[in-house]
Amino acid sequence: MSSQSFRQIIGLAPSTATITDSTLIIVDAQNEYAQGLLRVQEVDQSRKVIADLLSRYRYMAHVCVSTTARTGAELGYDVLVVRDGVSDRAIPGVEANVLVDVALKEVTDAFGTVIASGEIKGVIYPVIFLYLYIQDLI
C-alpha cells in the first residue's frame, strides 16, 4: 500500500488555482537565501518563476499596498514601498496614476518610506521587496 497525504486521507482533492480565484503570497524570498550564509539552490530559476507569477497577479496601491504598509507600521516594522513596483486601476472620479500618487504620499506622510527600485543596494528583485513585508504580517 502506498502512503497517503493528510488531504488524501480526509478526501480532499488537490487544489487548483487561477489568477481570478486565488491570492499570490510570496513567502520569504529574501536575499539572505540568494547570497548569504543560508544560500539555497536554483535561486535564479525560482526568481524567474516568482517574477512571472507576480506579473500575472498584480495588486492595487489604494487597497493592498497602503493597507499592508499601515499594518506593518502599526506592528512596528520599518516599512519601505518600492514606488516603481506599484500600480493601480482607475476608480470612479480618480485616474490610476493619481490614485497611486496619493496612496504613496499617505504612506510617506505617516507609515513608511517610498523609494525607487534603483535605490535598493545589492542584487534584489525590487517588486518582491514589498512582498517580504506581507509575509511578515501573515
Curated annotation (Swiss-Prot):
Pathway listed: Secondary metabolite biosynthesis; Alkaloid biosynthesis; Mycotoxin biosynthesis
Catalysed reaction equations from the record: [(1'E)-5'-(3',3'-dimethyloxiran-2'-yl)-3'-hydroxy-3'-methylpent-1'-en-1'-yl]-quinolinone B = yaequinolone C
Family statement drawn from the similarity comment of this UniProt entry: Belongs to the isochorismatase family.
InterPro entries: Isochorismatase-like_dom, Isochorismatase-like_sf
Keywords for the protein's UniProt record, in alphabetical order: Hydrolase
One MF annotation (Gene Ontology) recorded for this entry: hydrolase activity
Intrachain disulfide bonds: none
Name of the protein: Isochorismatase-like protein asqB
The UniProt record lists the keyword Hydrolase: yes
Role summary: Isochorismatase-like protein; part of the gene cluster that mediates the biosynthesis of the aspoquinolone mycotoxins. Within the pathway, asqB converts [(1'E)-5'-(3',3'-dimethyloxiran-2'-yl)-3'-hydroxy-3'-methylpent-1'-en-1'-yl]-quinolinone B into yaequinolone C. The first step of the pathway is catalyzed by the nonribosomal peptide synthetase asqK that condenses anthranilic acid and O-methyl-L-tyrosine to produce 4'-methoxycyclopeptin. 4'-methoxycyclopeptin is then converted to 4'-methoxydehydrocyclopeptin by the ketoglutarate-dependent dioxygenase asqJ.
Species classification: Eukaryota, Fungi, Dikarya, Ascomycota, Pezizomycotina
Hydrolase recorded as keyword: yes
SUPFAM superfamilies associated with the record: Isochorismatase-like hydrolases (SSF52499)
Enzyme class: hydrolase
UniProt EC number: 3.-.-.-
